[in-house]
Each structure stands twice: as C-alpha cells, then as structure tokens.
Amino acid sequence: MRMRWLLYPRLALTNLVKNRRLTLPYLLACAGTVLMFYTMDELSINRGLSKLRDAASVQAVLFLGVLVIGIFAAIVLYYTNGFLIKGRMKELGLYSVLGMEKRHISLVLLLETLFTGLVGVGVGLALGVLFGKLMFLLLLRLLGETAALPFQVSLEALGQTCLVFACIFALILLSNLRSVKKARPMELVQAAKAGEKEPKSSAFTTVFGLLCLGGGYAIAILSKSPLDALLYFFVAVLLVIFGTHALFRSGSIALLKMLRANKRFYYRPAHFIAVSGMLYRMRKNAAGLANICILCTMVLVVVSATVSLYVGQEHALRLQHPRDVSVEIQGQAAESLEDADFYAMAQQLAAARGLALSEHAKTIAIRCYAEQRGSYFDFDGVSENVCRLYLLPLEEYVAMGGEDVALQEGEVLVFSTRSSGYGLDKVELLGGSFQVKEELAEFPIAERSDVSLETGVYLVFANRAQAELAMGGRQWEAYLYEGFNLLGEEDEKLAFSSEYCNLVNRKIDEEAEIDYAVASSIYLDGQRWQALHGGFLFLGLFLGTLFMMATVLIIYYKQVSEGLEDSARYQTMQKVGMSKREVRASIDKQIVWVFFLPLAAAVVHTMVAFPAISKMEALFFVNDMGLMLACTLATIAAFSLLYVAAYLLTARVYYRIVS
C-alpha cells in the first residue's frame, strides 16, 4: 500500500522532468512573477521608505503596482497553464486507458501543481530576498534620494506572497481537474491533436471590429483637453481591445481566404502550406495574436509614458516656477502685505547660508477669472475657456525686467500662456475695449505652454488707473507676486527653500482676509516630483518587464504547440516530394505572419494613442512634445529588438520540433 502511494509522487516528478520543454518555461514564469510581486510588495511596506519626505505618494504608487502585478500574474499563469495542459492531454488520456481512474489522475495533477508551486514560489522568493536590496537601491536612485536608508527582509511580504500564489495555483488546479473530469479517455487522447474547423469570416464581426477600433482611435485623436483624455482614455482602451480581437479573428481570415482565392499565389508549395495551415487553425491563432498585440501595446504605452514623465520633469518644473522661489497672495490683504519685505527676509536667510539672490521680480496686479469669447472676457459666465486675467501697470512690468514701451490710454500689451498665443488685435472688458499695441512673446513671471487647465492672460496697461478702469467698477482683489532665483550649492538651496517658505507661510497665516496664498520653491517641488515620477518610472519598468515576460511566454508556447501539431504534417509533405528548403520557406512565411503582425499592430495602436497620452501627461505639467515623441520612438525601437530576439529564440524551438 505504501509503495502504491509513493508511485504518485514519483510519477508526478517524472512527468515534470519528461515534459521539461513545456514545464521549464512555466516554472520560470512562476518564479518571475513571484519575484516581481514579492519585490513590489516588500518595497510598498518597507519601513525605510517611510522616512522619505514624500513617502505616502511613493508607497501609494507601489501599492498600485502590487495590485496590478497580482492580478496580471494570475491571468498570465492561468493562460499559459492552458497551453501546458493541452500539450499533455494525450499523456493523461493514456493513463486513463491503461487503467488509472480519474481520481488517480487528479492526484497526480495535484502533486504536480504542488511541486511546481513549491519550486516556483521558492525560487522566486529566494531571488527576491537576494536582489531585494538592489531593487531598493535602484528605487532610491530613481527617487533622487542620497541618504542611506535601512532595508530589511519583510516577513509580512513573504507571507502575503505565499498566500496570493497559493490561491493562484489552487485556481489553476481546479481548472485542470475540471478539464479532466469532463473529458472521456479517448477525448483526452485526441485532445492534443484536435484541430480547428475552418472558421468563417463574419461580416458582423468585421464591422463590429472596425467600429470599435475606429471609435477608440477617434477618442484618442480627437480628445481636446487633458481632462477629456483622462476621462475617456480607458473607454478607448476597451474599444481598441474589442476591435483588435474582432479584426484579428475575422479580418485575418478574410485576408487568408483572399490569398487562397488567388490561384497564381496560392498554388505554390511554400504559399500553399503556409496559407492553408494558418487558415485551418485561425480561430485559435487569432485569439493568441490579439493577446500578443495587446500585451505589446501595454509594454509600449506604460514604459514610454513613465519614461517621458521622468525625463520631462525638469522642463515641467520650470514651467511651474518662472523663478526659483516665489510668493503669491490674493485677497483684500494682498495690498497691505506689499510693505511686508519678503525679499529682505530672503536676503538675510540667503546670506546666512552663503547663497546669492538674482532676478528679483515683484508686482501688485489685479487677478480675476473670466470666460474668453474671442476678444471679449465675460466675468459672469465662467464655464468654458476659463482664463486667469492679470491686469498690471506698465511701470511694474518694466520693474520686473520687461521692455519699456510707450503706451497710450486705451492700449495694452498682451501675453497669453497658451502656446498659440492670444492672436487678436483687441481686448474687450467691462470697462471698455482696448487696442493690442503688441503681443508679447515672453513674460518675466510666466511661461508659454498648454499644460495648465486654465489659460493665463497678462494685460499691461499704461498706468494703474487704466487697469482699475478696465474692471468697469466690478469689485476686485489684489494679487501680489514676488519671486527670485538662487545662486549657490544645491543642498543649501533646498535648506533655504524649506526655511524661507515656512517663515513666509507663517506670516501669511496671520492675515485673515486672504483668499489664496502660497510660498513655493522649485527645489521643494522638485523633490516631491522626483519621488512621484521616480515611483511611476519604477512601476512602469516593472510592469513593462512583466508584460514582456508574458509576451515571450505566449510566443514560446505558441511555437511549441504549433510545432507539435505541424511536425507530422511537414514530414508527410517531405515524403510526397517537397524538399527541406521548400518546407523551411513555408515555415518562415507562417512564422513571420504569426509573430510580426501583432508587433506592427501594437506600434500603430501606440502611435494613435500618443495624442491622448501626451494630453494626460500635461496633467503632470509635461508638455515637451519632442521629448515625449523621442521617448516613445526609443521605447518602440528597444522593444522591437527584444521582440525580434524572442522570436528568433522561440523559432529555433519550432524548427527543431518540425524537423
């Protein structure tokens, strides 16, 4: 009896070793997903990260990564297990024919799943513990953190990883047991060789796919604002996924049938084998090709977007901070604070830290919100095309470093933060119409870009009386801006910024009649942005690696499963007169069709999504289109090289099988 029960563990181990062509990649995938999940989970709860200045935002990004990796790991392992179990159906059927009951087969599958899980989770956790410190240091590097923070292995993360993957393997086991329980012995024997009936090209599916794909593309291209792009992007993603599956299923079949109808093309040995073989199993291939395409698109979008955010943060910071340090106050108390010498406070603090101040700018302006309708600014209809209006006298514009221009009453200088500029010859306000003497190409305390949800319009009048007259008797509040740049050591700039902003904010808090007040620094915000964008880049690279691993795994199993199905067929073709060269040519055509069409479609999806992605990145104040395009193209080039390498490696497996 004891020997009988020892038979099943031995049989399970023998099966895993004998089928190593299928089980080894699966074990590597298990170990890889465990490694990535554990690493992300360990970092998200690491006590060392809690000592960072913006630990909450970093850990929130990492926790999001834990959820995404956990869900995707379950999908990838479940999907690839389907390839694995189908390749072994004949073997399991033979066990049944030879007298093993289904409960015995189920026991073997249970033990195989247990051994696979133990090895996969064990290797993944061992690698996670081994390289955890390295990943921690990489994350700190991306976050711009130079201080040495403590790192220790988290027992909590180890336990959570074991629990999550125990659940995943339990679901996979239940799926395998269900397949065996439903099948009959001869069905198990024939399952591995079960072919697909020639699918029909459905006009409805084709039209549905075109509509979905067209709708998704339209949303991505026609979104006018960052908010529109953000709100509708995930709708576009779903439409593109549905459209991709529908068109790969029906469009590819229609194309193959068109090639088959072309007798001059079809009745050549290489074309005949490739086209007929693809058409015969197209229903299965279509789903696989669509999944590969979607995974490739996910890699390209996630990596290019996070790299763009990280690389473009310096330019984005400068758009938000025309001066290194600034104070902005709006309210009835703003004018009363004009005598509060914030600049003198800064000079004292800077001298104590060995810093110098430069490019000082200060103004008291009128700031209000209005809806722009052509040249008319409506103060009562603030709904769409919202603008922040700044009205200031010429003398203060000149004092900030602007050019001294002779302005008459009824004339204004205009600067718009919109990249296209203002573009009109007059400005109509409640107090009358004003002729635009000159549209300014630059302004001392503002930059031109489209990253903000609101356009800033600066109007320079001949004197303060003209600016107040332009309001047409409407009640307004003063706006105080004071800013300057810092010269000196970077560490001292950061320390100065923290101390100065705290002092100014405490002084401002003493005033009750203030609607808006903030003291800010490019160095403090830069530290916060580095933490947020560094966390996003780390997550993007992690997810990109995970998606790439899933892509390679699916490609590999498709090569193996198709090679096993095609082996006997190609040997038969050689026996009836086809040369090895002709067989190899037909294989090449089929492989290229199967594995490079998804890459081409993914590149198209990514480039169509680029306008929407660039608008969403504007919410993070990244608006350098040249930089974003360069990051996207570089990501496509790098991924294409990896994809070609994966294709070449897996194609060798296919050739060995069919030969």
Indicate residue ranges for each PLM-predicted region.
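Selective transmembrane-helix segments that form parts of the transport pathway or gating/packing helices
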Residues: 20, 26, 109-127, 199-206, ...
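Short cytosolic juxtamembrane segments of multi-pass membrane proteins
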Residues: 2-6, 182-196, 564-565, 655-659
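Small-residue-rich transmembrane alpha-helices
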Residues: 32-45, 79-83, 90, 116-145, ...
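Basic-flanked hydrophobic alpha-helices used for secretion and membrane insertion
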Residues: 317-330, 336-549
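Peri-transmembrane interface segments
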Residues: 21-28, 36-68, 83-86, 94-95, ...
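Alpha-helical transmembrane segments, especially those used as permease/efflux helices
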Residues: 22-30, 35-39, 163-168, 197-309, ...
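Long, hydrophobic alpha-helical segments
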Residues: 64-79, 550-551
